Amino acid sequence: DRSPSRGLGDVYKRQAGDSASYYEENGEFHFDVGTINIIVLTNVSLEPGTLANGLVTATEAKTVALNNLRIPSQFSNGFATGTGTDGIAIFSNMESKNRLSNAGKHSKLGELIAKCVIESISEAIKRQVWITKESQCSDLARLRRYDLDINEFYSNIGDDKEEFIKSLQEAARKQENVAVTTSILHLIDEVENDLLDKKVAYNLAASILENNCKDYCIQKLLEFWINKFLS
């Protein structure tokens, strides 16, 4: 119920035992992504077709904002392009003498719409779910979009789990490790989209890992991912 009569406190009332809104792991907070509502206000006169054109531009810009942060889909191994309940509205000033005929990507209006949407969504995501470019610069953040049971990995590492996880948390933030992880995940994506042969991708991923990753914990983690998706 999204009735205006309901106050903020009513919206957040819940019963003990209800599904959590977030979980915390080692100082990192993970939230379920909510609805993205976009309102675009212009001070020019736009015909219905131009308004529709602007809607398309704004929708594409929303996807750009999500992809820039590498936000994962909650239902597949791909990147999110939005949520299932997103809304968008665009308004024009019908009294304006400045009438524009295009709001697509080639037009200045389209450029401004897209830039505003990207900036506002990026800021909203930062404030609402604390996802930023800095928080996404992590091996663990990049790997999160793949539906694997991390407990299965931990149960088979054969090392001191506490020390291993401590080392992993530190090594996962190194940019060189994030670069290696991103390269290997790109190969996995290529295979999942039938753009690359699995054997070729496996050999390349193994070579990238062997020649570019020096942290034992990251090596073990990525070996697990490679074997799960490319072997």
Predicted regions located by residue number:
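Charged, amphipathic alpha-helical linkers/stalks
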Residues: 115-170
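C-terminal non-catalytic accessory extensions
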Residues: 189-231
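Short amphipathic alpha-helical segments that mediate assembly, nucleic-acid/protein binding
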Residues: 150, 161-165, 180-181, 201, ...
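C-terminal non-catalytic alpha-helical accessory regions
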Residues: 164, 170-185, 192-196
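Glycine-rich, often proline-containing surface loops adjacent to acidic residues and nearby aromatics
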Residues: 33-41
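Single conserved hydrophobic/aromatic residue that forms the stacking wall/gate
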Residues: 1-12
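Polyanion-binding surfaces on beta-sheet-dominated domains and ring/shell assemblies
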Residues: 13-19, 23-25, 30, 42, ...
